[in-house]
């Protein structure tokens, strides 16, 4: 992460403020502005953690804050340590520690061994802007607290950022949920991460989720989640990427489209290719439609690329989906509170009935994709090549990017879809 100091702004400062709040160094306004209160909290944190107290958040201070970014600490066992004393030191619980450390024997702690200690707050924040760095912290935190959740890479973005996936379950049936093919639809990232966290917790504690036994879902279905398909674009829209070669190139591209606000109107990957127009399912028709609208070269949105799958993010999703061969996919977008369920005349078995179930639990409407945007999408390609149920979920209402204040409603509306997707 970049160095933060007095006068810094942006989502990295929001995350810093959140971490300081979590660590009880002041109730800070999460406004993304590194002002006097934030600096004073940093100074107190540095002083109490044996760091140089200069009020500047450099590599050493970031490292010290990682437990409050990720939601877990690592504790090296000392003589006379017990799980009780370790839990008390961090405000954790014995059960949380046992879940995070399968096989750990409380009566046989080895001096020098390392214990993962969950901290007493939710991992996934729902009140700040998301970035690729925050996504990675959440992925790490979920996997550490709930080690039955497996994590890995779908691939890499243009800028080399990891396209993460998480998976949970041991059933033969596989489903695949993904979000943020479009940069300014980044609010869908915490939707999927929060679902993963809630589901993992419900399974670990023997609880239900949306009225269903998490254990039964876990035994029946393996849920795969790719929370952020376009991390470079998300960083551009949320303000984390605000300088450098890639930013300047995106700014030059956007200058050719003055009617699209920059960076808030940016949907594409960092090279100006719309990732949800990159799949080999009527790509030529998508090209005709978008060229007719004037999107003939890299753009903030709607440019189909020079050929299908030239964007590394789309290629990675394509290859990963082929290897996974899921029974059902959900592609999360915003906005409109709409469920798109078919591609051309393809209607996989039960796909309409499943869509109607999703509508019933969410309040969303079921509609056909408009012709002008009805080709070359991820959902379109999946239905065409697999002949299995695939859905684009347009969450929330308003102008993209939707404000994080909509998160609670969006999540409540979509929890049933995410659970039923693993059951139908």
Indicate residue ranges for each PLM-predicted region:
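Conserved hydrophobic/aromatic packing and binding residues within compact polymer-binding modules
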Residues: 17, 42-45, 97
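Short beta-strand-to-loop junctions in surface cap/lid or active-site-entrance loops
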Residues: 164-173, 180
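C-terminal accessory segments enriched in acidic
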Residues: 78, 83, 95, 111, ...
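Extracellular-facing binding/remodeling surfaces
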Residues: 1-2, 18-31
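Loop/turn elements at helix/coil->beta-strand transitions in domains of secreted/extracellular proteins
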Residues: 147-150, 161, 172-174, 219-224, ...
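Primarily a LysM-type cell-wall glycan-binding module
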Residues: 8-18, 31-36, 67-91, 113, ...
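Short glycine- and acidic-rich boundary segments immediately preceding or forming the N-terminal edge
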Residues: 3, 85, 96, 116-162
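Active-site/substrate-binding loop(s) of hydrolase catalytic cores
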Residues: 172, 186-187, 192-196, 200-340, ...
């Amino acid at each position: 992460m970049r160095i933060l100091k007095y006068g810094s702004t942006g989502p990295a400062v929001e995350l810093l403020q959140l971490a300081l709040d979590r660590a009880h160094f002041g109730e800070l306004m999460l406004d993304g502005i590194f002002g006097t209160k934030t600096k004073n909290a940093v100074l107190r944190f540095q002083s109490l953690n044996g760091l140089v107290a200069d009020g500047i958040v450099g590599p050493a201070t970031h490292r010290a804050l990682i437990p409050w970014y990720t939601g877990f600490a690592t504790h090296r066992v000392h003589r006379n340590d017990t799980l009780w004393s370790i839990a008390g030191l961090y405000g954790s619980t014995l059960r949380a520690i046992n879940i995070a450390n399968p096989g750990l024997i409380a009566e046989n702690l080895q001096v020098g061994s390392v214990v993962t200690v969950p901290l007493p707050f939710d991992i996934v924040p729902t009140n700040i802007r998301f970035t690729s760095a925050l996504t990675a912290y959440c992925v790490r935190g979920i996997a550490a607290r709930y080690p039955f959740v497996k994590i890995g890479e779908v691939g890499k973005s243009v800028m080399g950022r990891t396209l993460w996936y998480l998976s949970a379950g041991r059933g033969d049936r596989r489903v695949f949920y993904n979000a943020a093919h479009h940069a300014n639809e980044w609010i869908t990232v915490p939707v999927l991460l929060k679902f993963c966290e809630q589901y993992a917790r419900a399974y670990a504690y023997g609880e239900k989720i949306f009225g269903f036994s998490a254990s039964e879902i876990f035994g029946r279905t393996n849920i795969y989640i790719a929370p952020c398909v376009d991390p470079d674009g998300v960083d551009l829209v949320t303000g984390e990427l605000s300088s450098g070669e890639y930013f300047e190139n995106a700014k030059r591209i956007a200058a050719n489209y003055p009617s699209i606000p920059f960076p808030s109107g940016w949907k594409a990957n960092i090279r100006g290719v719309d990732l949800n127009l990159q799949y080999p399912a009527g790509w030529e028709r998508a090209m005709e439609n978008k060229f007719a609208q004037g999107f003939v070269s890299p753009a903030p949105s709607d440019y189909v690329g020079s050929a299908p799958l030239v964007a590394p993010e789309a290629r990675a999703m394509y290859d990963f989906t082929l290897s996974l061969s899921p029974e059902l996919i959900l592609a999360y977008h915003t906005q409109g509170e709409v469920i798109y369920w078919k591609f051309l005349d393809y209607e996989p078995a039960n796909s309409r009935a499943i869509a109607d179930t999703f509508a019933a639990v969410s309040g969303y409407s079921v509609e056909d994709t408009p012709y002008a945007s009805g080709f070359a999408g991820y959902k379109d390609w999946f239905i065409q090549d697999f002949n299995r149920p695939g859905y684009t979920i347009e969450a929330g209402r308003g102008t993209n990017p939707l404000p994080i204040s909509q998160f609670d409603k969006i999540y409540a509306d979509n929890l049933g879809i995410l659970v039923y997707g693993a059951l139908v």
